[in-house]
Swiss-Prot record:
This is DNA mismatch repair protein MutS. It comes from Sinorhizobium medicae (strain WSM419) (Ensifer medicae). GO terms for cellular component: cytosol. One of its GO terms (biological process) is mismatch repair. One of its GO terms (molecular function) is ATP-dependent DNA damage sensor activity.
Length: 915
C-alpha cells in the first residue's frame, strides 16, 4: 500500500513524489525544500514527520492524508513549482498520541529529526540548512513503545512468500513480534491462506508485489485491506535467504535451528530484512525461529472465526467476545498467551491434556493459586522492556521492569518448590530457575527505588552503588548551601545586607547589588581586585569573583559528571540484561503460562466449568452444555439462568462417521445459541481449558466450520444468498470425517423449493461424503424425513409451550421434530401492527390448508438418495402437454374467424383435459 505520492494517487493538484523528485522541482526548490524532497524520495511509502522547531510538519500529499486521518487543520506554506504547498503539523511533545492514531489506521511514519547543531550548519555557509535524517521508521508491525502497543495483544509483522516449483506453488508465512522477540514460521497453501493469516492476526503483512497483484489472490488482500503491504520481490529471494538469516544471528549455518523449506526461508529472511530496515539496522532480541505445523492446530475458516466472535465481536469490540469472557489473567504476557491459545487450538490430545492437568492442579489448590496470582500481579512486561533495551530505546523503568519481573519470578519459584506439579508447571518452574540470580543482585544493588522515565533525567542509580557518583552528587546537591555561605561572607565583607548571589543561563552565578550600593564594591583597589564587574542594569550592578567562578565550574562539572556516570551505568546494565535475553524470555513465558493456567482455574471455579475428556476418538458428547458468553451476560444482568442442553454427535454403535443433528424449532427458540455453544465448547477444550458443561468427551476436531448469520458482500458484488452459498461450498469441499460443522438456515435466502433442495442435498453430502460431526438448524421441516434414510442423522427440536395464543420459549433441546416455526408470534412480539399480524394469520391458515391437500413433501419423500432428481417442472409436465403446445404454435389468430378461434380453443382445452 503506497498511500502517498504517485501521480495516480494525487488529491486535486497536489504534487506527487515523482513530480517533486524531477529536475525542474529540484532546480527551483529552496534549500529546506530540497532537503525535504530528498528525504521524502527515500521514504515514499511513509508519511514523513519533518522536524521544524517544536513541531513535526508534513507537506504535500502527506499533509492531505494526515490532516484527514488525524482531524487536524490543513493549511499551506508558500508555493513550489507554481502551486501552493499543503501543510499540517503536530507538536513534538504530543507526537506519540498522533503516531498511535496513524498506526491504528495502518499508516507507516518516517520520523525525521535534526542531526546536527545549528551552529555547525552556520559554519558551512549562510544558506546551509541544518542536516536532518530519518531516525525512526514507525510501522504497524514494528513498534515497541508502550504507548503505541496494547498490553494484552501481540503485535505481529508477517511475511508471506511464494515459491513456484512444480505444478503447485509453495507458500509460507513468517511472523515476528519485535516487542517480545517471538519468531515463528509455517507452511501454508492458497486454499487456507486467509484462514492462517487471520489466525495470527498480524498488524502488518509484507509480501512480494507480484503476489499482491495476482488476480487469483485479490480476494484475500481485499479482506486484509491496509494490513497487506507489497514489497519488491527481491526481498523474498530464496537463493539468498539462508545467508541473510545466518548473518542476522551471527551463525555460519542454520542447521542448528532445524529444517525449513525454501518458502519458509524466503518468508523468514524477508521479515528479518524488513525489521532491520525499519529499525535502522538495530537488531531486536529475536528468538530462534520456531516452525509450526499446519496439522498441529485446529483449522478455523475466516467466516467461522468471525461468526463465533472469538477475539472480537462482529462490530469489532473485545467486550462480548469469547476471549473477554475467558480472560482472568493478571499479566500482559498471560493475556497475550491466552489469546494465542484461543486463536490456535491444538489437535494433539497429549499437549491439550498437559494444559488441562495444570488447570486441574491449580483448581484443586485455591490458596496456592491465589498466592501465585498475587505474585504475578507484581510482574511487569519483561519481554517488551527487554526489546526496547535491545533496540536502544529503553529507559530506567525498563531496567526496573526486568528487575521487578525477576523478583516476581523468584517469589513464584519459591511457591512452586516442593509442590507436586503438572508437567507444564514443572517446566515453568525449571525455566524460572534458569534466571541469572547474580544479574538480579546487580540490578538490586544499582537501581534506585523511584525511577525516572528518561535516562537523561538521571537519579536512577541508588546511593552507594558508585563512590565517585556519590561524591559528585554531594558537590552538586550541596551547592545551594555552599553558595548561601559565600553570599553571607560577601555581605559581611562589604557591609551590604541586600547583596545576593543569583544564577541565570547567560551569566551563570553572579553577585547582584543595588546601584546605590555598587560603590562599596568598586571604590577601593581591593574591592576592584576582588569583585569583577559583569553587567550594569537600570537599578542594579552585577559582579563575580574568582572564587565564585571556580565554584560554578565545579558545580557544573559535578552535574555533568553525575549524569555521565549514570548513563555509563545504564549502558553497562543494559548490556548485561540483553546478554541474558534468552533466559529472561524463557522465564517470562513461564510466568505467562502459570498466569494462563491459574486464570483458567479461577474461571473454572467461578463459572462451574468441568474438565473435558479429550482424545483421538470421534466422540462429541456434551452433557449440560452452556454458552460461555451468554451465560456470563445473563449473570451480570441478574436474569434467568442459562438453560443447559446436551449434545451427542458421537458415531452411533458400529459406525465410523460422526452423527448429525437436524435441529428444528421456532424463531427465538435458541437454535443459533445452541449451535454456537457447541462450537465454542470444542474450541475451549482444544485450547486446553475447562468447559461450560457438566461433562464433556471430545475426540479432537481437525477443522471447524460454521455457517451462521447472514450478511451481504456488496463490495465484491455478492448478495447475502451468494455469500451463504460460497461459505457452504467451502464447508462441503473441505470438511473431513474429523471435522465439526454447524450450519444454520441453509437455503433461506432464495425461493422455498430452491432453498429446500439445496438444504436437502447439503445434509446428504455431509452425511454420506464428509461423514463429519454436525449440527444443522433449519426451518425446512420437510427435511426431518431424512432421519428415516440417513442412519447417523437424528432429529432434535427446541421445545416451546403455547398458552392463550402466546408462545413460551423453553430454550430446551429434545428429540423430535417441530412442525411450526411460530414466526407470526415472534412478529407480534416484535411490534408489528395488529392488523398485519391478523392478516398474516389468515394467510397462514389458507396456506396450511392448501399444503394439507397437496403436500410438497410427497414429492420430496420420493427423492432417491444422491441421484439427480427430475426437475419439478419436468415431473409436472403431462405427455400431451407438448402436443398442445405444438397445436398452439400452429395457430395464426390473424387468419382465423371468431368461430374458428373459438373451436380451436375448445380443442386445446380438450387436449389438456385428457392429460
Amino acid at each position: 500500500m503506497n498511500f502517498l505520492m504517485d501521480a495516480s494517487n494525487r488529491t486535486g493538484d497536489v504534487l506527487s513524489v515523482s513530480d517533486l523528485a524531477s529536475e525542474e522541482s529540484r532546480s527551483t526548490a529552496t534549500p529546506m525544500m530540497e532537503q525535504f524532497i530528498e528525504i521524502k524520495a527515500n521514504n515514499r511509502d511513509s508519511l514523513l514527520f519533518y522536524r521544524m522547531g517544536d513541531f513535526y510538519e508534513l507537506f504535500f500529499q502527506d499533509a492531505v492524508e494526515a490532516s484527514r486521518a488525524l482531524g487536524i487543520t490543513l493549511t499551506k506554506r508558500g508555493q513550489h513549482m507554481g502551486q501552493e504547498i499543503p501543510m499540517c503539523g503536530v507538536p513534538v511533545h504530543a507526537a506519540d498520541d498522533y503516531l498511535q492514531k496513524l498506526i491504528a489506521l495502518g499508516y507507516r511514519v518516517a520520523v525525521c529529526e535534526q542531526v546536527e547543531d545549528p551552529a555547525e550548519a552556520k559554519k558551512r555557509g549562510g544558506k546551509s540548512v541544518v542536516r536532518r535524517d530519518v531516525v525512526r521508521l514507525v510501522t504497524p508491525g514494528t513498534i515497541t513503545e508502550d504507548k503505541l502497543l496494547s498490553p494484552s495483544e501481540s503485535n505481529y509483522l508477517m511475511a508471506l512468500a511464494r515459491i513456484r516449483s512444480g505444478s503447485e506453488p509453495a507458500y509460507a508465512l513468517a511472523w515476528i513480534d519485535i516487542s517480545t522477540g517471538i519468531f515463528r514460521l509455517a507452511e501454508t497453501a492458497e486454499s487456507r491462506l486467509l484462514a492462517d493469516i487471520l489466525r495470527i492476526e498480524p498488524r502488518e503483512l509484507i509480501l512480494p508485489d507480484t503476489v499482491f497483484h495476482d488476480p487469483d489472490l485479490r480476494p484475500v488482500f481485499d479482506v486484509l485491506g491496509r494490513v497487506a503491504v507489497p514489497q519488491p520481490a527481491i526481498l523474498f529471494d530464496s537463493a539468498t535467504a539462508e545467508g541473510r538469516i545466518s548473518r542476522y544471528y551471527g551463525v555460519g549455518t542454520l542447521d542448528g535451528f532445524g529444517s525449513f523449506s525454501r518458502a519458509e526461508l524466503a518468508a523468514a529472511s524477508a521479515a528479518v530484512s524488513y525489521v532491520e530496515k525499519t529499525q535502522l539496522q538495530e537488531r531486536p532480541a529475536l528468538g530462534i525461529p520456531e516452525r509450526e505445523s499446519a496439522a498441529s492446530t485446529l483449522f478455523i475458516d475466516p467466516a467461522t472465526r468471525a461468526n463465533l466472535e472469538l477475539a472480537k465481536t462482529l462490530s469489532g469490540s473485545r467486550d462480548g467476545s469469547l476471549l473477554k469472557s475467558l480472560d482472568r489473567t493478571v499479566t500482559s504476557g498471560g493475556a497475550r498467551l491466552l489469546a494465542e491459545r484461543l486463536m490456535s487450538p491444538l489437535t494433539d490430545p497429549e499437549r491439550i491434556n498437559r494444559r488441562l492437568d495444570s488447570i486441574e492442579m491449580l483448581a484443586d489448590q485455591p490458596r496456592f493459586t491465589a498466592d501465585a496470582r498475587d505474585a504475578l500481579r507484581r510482574a511487569p512486561d519483561m519481554p517488551r522492556a527487554l526489546s526496547r533495551l535491545a533496540l536502544g530505546r529503553g529507559g530506567p523503568r525498563d531496567l526496573g521492569a526486568i528487575q521487578a519481573g525477576m523478583r516476581a519470578a523468584v517469589a513464584i519459584a519459591a511457591l512452586l518448590s516442593g509442590a507436586e506439579l503438572s508437567v507444564e508447571l514443572a517446566e515453568a518452574r525449571d525455566a524460572i530457575a534458569g534466571l541469572p540470580r547474580d544479574l538480579l543482585a546487580r540490578l538490586d544493588a544499582t537501581l534506585a527505588e523511584e525511577l525516572p522515565l528518561l535516562k537523561r533525567d538521571g537519579g536512577f542509580v541508588r546511593e552507594g552503588a558508585n563512590a565517585e557518583l556519590d561524591e559528585m552528587r554531594a558537590l552538586r546537591d550541596q551547592s545551594r548551601r555552599v553558595v548561601a555561605g559565600l553570599q553571607l561572607q560577601y555581605c559581611e565583607e562589604t557591609g551590604i545586607k541586600s547583596l545576593k548571589i543569583k544564577h541565570n543561563n547567560v551569566l551563570g552565578y553572579f553577585i547582584e547589588v543595588t546601584a546605590g550600593n555598587a560603590g562599596a564594591m568598586i571604590d577601593t583597589d581591593a574591592g576592584r581586585a576582588r569583585f569583577i564587574h559583569r553587567q550594569t542594569m537600570a537599578n542594579a550592578m552585577r559582579f563575580t569573583t574568582t572564587e565564585l567562578a571556580e565554584l560554578e565550574t565545579k558545580i557544573a562539572n559535578a552535574a555533568d559528571r553525575v549524569l555521565a556516570i549514570e548513563l555509563e551505568t545504564f549502558e553497562v546494565m543494559t548490556r548485561e540484561v540483553v546478554a541474558e535475553a534468552e533466559a529472561i524470555k524463557a522465564a517470562a513465558l513461564a510466568l505467562a503460562t502459570i498466569d494462563v493456567s491459574a486464570g483458567l482455574a479461577v474461571l473454572a471455579e467461578e463459572q462451574n466449568y468441568t474438565r473435558p475428556a479429550v482424545d483421538r476418538s470421534r466422540m462429541f458428547a456434551i452433557d449440560g452444555g452452556r454458552h460461555p458468553v451468554v451465560e456470563q451476560a445473563l449473570r451480570r444482568q441478574a436474569a434467568n439462568p442459562f438453560v443447559a442442553n446436551g449434545c451427542d454427535l458421537s458415531p452411533p454403535g458400529g459406525e465410523e462417521g460422526g452423527a448429525i443433528w437436524l435441529l428444528t424449532g421456532p424463531n427465538m427458540g435458541g437454535k443459533s445459541t445452541f449451535l454456537r455453544q457447541n462450537a465454542l465448547i470444542a474450541i475451549m477444550a482444544q485450547m486446553g481449558s475447562f468447559v461450560p458443561a457438566s461433562a464433556a468427551h471430545i475426540g479432537v476436531v481437525d477443522r471447524l466450520f460454521s455457517r451462521v448469520g447472514a450478511s451481504d458482500d456488496l463490495a465484491r458484488g455478492r448478495s447475502t444468498f451468494m455469500v451463504e452459498m460460497v461459505e457452504t461450498a467451502a464447508i462441503l469441499n473441505q470438511a473431513t470425517d474429523r471435522s465439526l460443522v454447524i450450519l444454520d438456515e441453509i437455503g433461506r435466502g432464495t425461493a422455498t423449493f430452491d432453498g429446500l433442495s439445496i438444504a436437502w442435498a447439503a445434509v446428504e453430502h455431509l452425511h454420506e461424503v464428509n461423514r463429519c460431526r454436525g449440527l444443522f438448524a433449519t426451518h425446512f421441516h420437510e427435511l426431518t424425513v431424512l432421519s428415516e434414510k440417513l442412519g447417523r442423522l437424528s432429529n432434535a427440536t427446541m421445545r416451546v409451550k403455547e398458552w392463550d395464543g402466546d408462545v413460551i420459549f423453553l430454550h430446551e433441546v429434545g428429540p423430535g421434530a417441530a412442525d411450526r416455526s411460530y414466526g407470526i408470534q415472534v412478529a407480534r412480539l416484535a411490534g408489528l401492527p395488529a392488523s398485519v399480524v391478523a392478516r398474516a394469520r389468515d394467510v397462514l391458515a389458507k396456506l396450511e390448508d392448501a399444503d394439507r391437500k397437496n403436500p410438497a413433501s410427497q414429492l420430496i419423500d420420493d427423492l432417491p438418495l444422491f441421484q439427480v432428481a427430475v426437475r419439478r417442472e419436468e415431473a409436472a409436465r403431462a405427455p400431451g402437454l407438448s402436443r398442445a403446445e405444438e397445436a398452439l404454435k400452429a395457430l395464426n389468430p390473424d387468419d382465423m374467424t371468431p368461430r374458428e378461434a373459438l373451436d380451436a380453443l375448445y380443442a386445446l382445452k380438450k387436449q389438456l383435459s385428457n392429460r
